[in-house]
């Protein structure tokens, strides 16, 4: 069976091809922005910083007021007073003056609670002699302390208050001595020895 070329060409010509190409994507409209120019810069609001006043000036004022109060109560200074006691503990030395008052306790021109940082143990040290005799609100206590730390100063103040109470009345000796408030605690840090790391600690021993 013979097929002519003309019949094949006519059959191919009758076929139709459809294109499956995707349509051209649509572009979204973009909003045009204004061009940046140095001649018209944007307005920037200034940065405002607010600061609260520090409490240091208030504390300084309170200290100055207490200093004036102490100097008005102690004319001539600590050494010129009659009821005075000296206490020592470790490296701390405290000179204590007692005056009849309402129970104020001032250490180095500052309130005792503030000076001793509110430590209940240290506050107990300084108030024990007065509490033993029931004089918590009968005397004002003025203290000048230096040397050592706050713990040593508190114990030195305790001894100084007890010794000052003896000058008020000799009858105070028995109750104060019974509580051990008149005994000078002579314990101090033991000195370092040569060849040792501390007072008694020796370097590690190696046999070989």
UniProtKB/Swiss-Prot annotation:
Superkingdom per UniProt: Eukaryota
GO CC term (a single one): chloroplast
Subcellular location(s) per record: Plastid, Chloroplast
Comp. bias regions, Basic residues: 194-208
Keyword terms, alphabetized: Acetylation, Chloroplast, Plastid, Ribonucleoprotein, Ribosomal protein, RNA-binding, rRNA-binding, Transit peptide
Disulfide pairings: none
Keyword Transferase found: no
Primary location class: plastid
GO MF entry, a single one: RNA binding
GO terms under biological process: translation
Gene3D superfamilies in alphabetical order: 3.30.230.10
Similarity section: Belongs to the universal ribosomal protein uS9 family.
Assembly and binders: Component of the chloroplast small ribosomal subunit (SSU). Mature 70S chloroplast ribosomes of higher plants consist of a small (30S) and a large (50S) subunit. The 30S small subunit contains 1 molecule of ribosomal RNA (16S rRNA) and 24 different proteins. The 50S large subunit contains 3 rRNA molecules (23S, 5S and 4.5S rRNA) and 33 different proteins. uS9c binds directly to 16S ribosomal RNA. uS9c interacts with translation factor pY (PSRP1).
PANTHER family: RIBOSOMAL PROTEIN S9, SMALL RIBOSOMAL SUBUNIT PROTEIN US9M
Protein name: Small ribosomal subunit protein uS9c
Annotated organism of origin: Spinacia oleracea
Lineage start: Eukaryota, Viridiplantae, Streptophyta, Embryophyta, Tracheophyta
Name of the encoding gene: PRPS9
């Amino acid at each position: 069976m013979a097929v002519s070329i003309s019949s094949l060409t006519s059959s191919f010509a009758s076929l139709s091809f459809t294109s499956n190409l995707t349509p051209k994507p649509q572009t979204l409209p973009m909003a045009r922005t204004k061009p940046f120019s140095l001649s018209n810069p944007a307005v920037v609001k200034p940065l405002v910083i607010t600061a609260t006043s520090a409490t240091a000036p208030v504390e300084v004022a309170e200290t100055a007021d207490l200093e004036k109060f102490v100097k008005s109560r102690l004319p001539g200074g600590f050494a010129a007073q009659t009821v005075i006691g000296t206490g020592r503990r470790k490296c701390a030395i405290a000179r204590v003056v007692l005056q009849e008052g309402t129970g104020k306790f001032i250490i180095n021109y500052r309130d005792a609670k503030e000076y001793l940082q509110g430590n209940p143990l240290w506050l107990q040290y300084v108030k024990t002699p007065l509490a033993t005799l029931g004089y918590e609100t009968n005397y004002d206590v003025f203290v000048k302390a230096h040397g050592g730390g706050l713990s040593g100063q508190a114990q030195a103040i305790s001894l100084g208050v007890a010794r000052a109470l003896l000058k008020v009345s000799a009858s105070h000796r028995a109750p104060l001595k019974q509580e051990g408030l008149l005994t000078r605690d002579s314990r101090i840090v033991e000195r370092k020895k040569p060849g040792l790391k501390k007072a008694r600690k020796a370097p590690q021993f190696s046999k070989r």
